[in-house]
């Protein structure tokens, strides 16, 4: 079978939404070639468990590659992808070069080539993310292993916004906490929350692809008893009081429900936000404070920030 390799040259800021667009278009596997992976700070802090080849990466920007089957609808699908990517400009997302190219690959090449980009990665004091096909032995007795299948939707969990969220969950979630995961995507944050002791986690996403992806990853990691995944628009219709709300989505979306998040948290509860590009940090901080939150910590990695607020 013949496959088309779709390559989008963009920016780090646009990687996650473009990845989601490609998966929704039917991509079977996505590769992210980000030169920042070669020099990430966490190499020094945690130590990467594999070596990267600089020849596989662009000199600037980020290349997102996706694989679509060759068929009569391919160019129509490509046009839809281009339109969806261009619509990201409405959210003030920098698309950089924003070029798209196509080349043909054999199934044998596709089935093995993209796996070379995915290896176990230690992303925090406790957590290591491991692709499902990799054999991995924990280095420490208290190491927590999250298994992910990068062939599924919504990436591998090693994007800075996800890493910052997991580091915050590790720090602020307590045993038996109740947690809401807004815009769950792959479900990785719900998995992490369960692994650090949360007893009841509600994971929401408006996208049906995300809901199914999250369910699979939650089952894969053995935390189905603690996590419930449902299709829902942000916090609409949600009630009760909760210990932690976590949201790794665009800054503009976070701004829509800061008041709702405040109302749904217990006293001294935490709102962990991420997906915020550095230039929008002040805007989100101001909105959180106006909603009544106290800012307790701001974590940063590359151009991204995670803001932790307390009720």
From Swiss-Prot:
UniProt cross-references to Gene3D superfamilies, sorted A to Z: Vaccinia Virus protein VP39 (3.40.50.150)
InterPro entries assigned to the protein according to its UniProt record, in alphabetical order: Ribosomal_L11_MeTrfase_PrmA (IPR050078), Ribosomal_PrmA_MeTrfase (IPR004498), SAM-dependent_MTases_sf (IPR029063)
Pfam families in UniProt: PrmA
EC number(s) stated in the UniProt entry for this protein: 2.1.1.-
UniProt keyword annotations, A-Z: Cytoplasm, Methyltransferase, S-adenosyl-L-methionine, Transferase
GO BP terms in the entry: methylation
Domain of life assignment: Bacteria
Location (main, coarse): cytoplasm
NCBIfam families: prmA
Protein name: Ribosomal protein L11 methyltransferase
Taxonomy of the source species: Bacteria, Bacillati, Bacillota, Bacilli, Bacillales
């Amino acid at each position: 079978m013949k496959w088309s390799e779709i390559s989008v040259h963009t920016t780090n800021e646009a990687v996650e939404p473009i990845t989601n667009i490609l998966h929704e278009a039917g991509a079977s596997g996505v590769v992210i070639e980000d030169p920042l992976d070669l020099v990430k700070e966490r190499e020094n802090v945690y130590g990467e468990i594999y070596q990267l080849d600089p020849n596989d990466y662009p000199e600037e920007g980020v290349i997102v590659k996706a694989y679509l089957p060759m068929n009569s609808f391919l160019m129509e699908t490509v046009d839809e992808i281009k339109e969806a990517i261009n619509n990201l400009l409405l959210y003030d997302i920098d698309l950089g070069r924003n070029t798209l190219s196509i080349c043909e690959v054999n199934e044998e090449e596709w089935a093995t080539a993209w796996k070379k980009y995915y290896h176990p990665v230690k992303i925090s004091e406790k957590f290591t993310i491991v692709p499902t096909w990799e054999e991995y032995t924990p280095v420490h007795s208290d190491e927590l292993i999250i298994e992910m299948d990068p062939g599924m939707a919504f990436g591998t969990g090693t994007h800075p916004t996800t890493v910052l969220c997991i580091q915050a969950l590790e720090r602020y979630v307590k045993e038996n906490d109740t947690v809401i995961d807004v815009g769950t995507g792959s479900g990785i944050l719900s998995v992490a929350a369960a692994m650090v002791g949360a007893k009841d986690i509600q994971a929401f996403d408006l996208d049906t692809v995300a809901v199914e992806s999250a369910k699979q990853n939650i089952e894969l990691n053995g935390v189905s008893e603690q996590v419930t995944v449902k299709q829902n628009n942000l916090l609409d219709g949600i009630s009760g009081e909760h210990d932690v709300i976590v949201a790794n989505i665009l800054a503009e979306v976070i701004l829509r429900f800061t008041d709702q998040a405040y109302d749904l948290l217990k006293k001294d509860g935490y709102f962990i936000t991420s997906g915020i590009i550095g230039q929008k940090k002040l805007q989100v901080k101001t909105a959180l404070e106006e909603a009544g939150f106290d800012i307790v910590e701001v974590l940063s990695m590359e151009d991204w920030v995670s803001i932790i607020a307390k009720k």
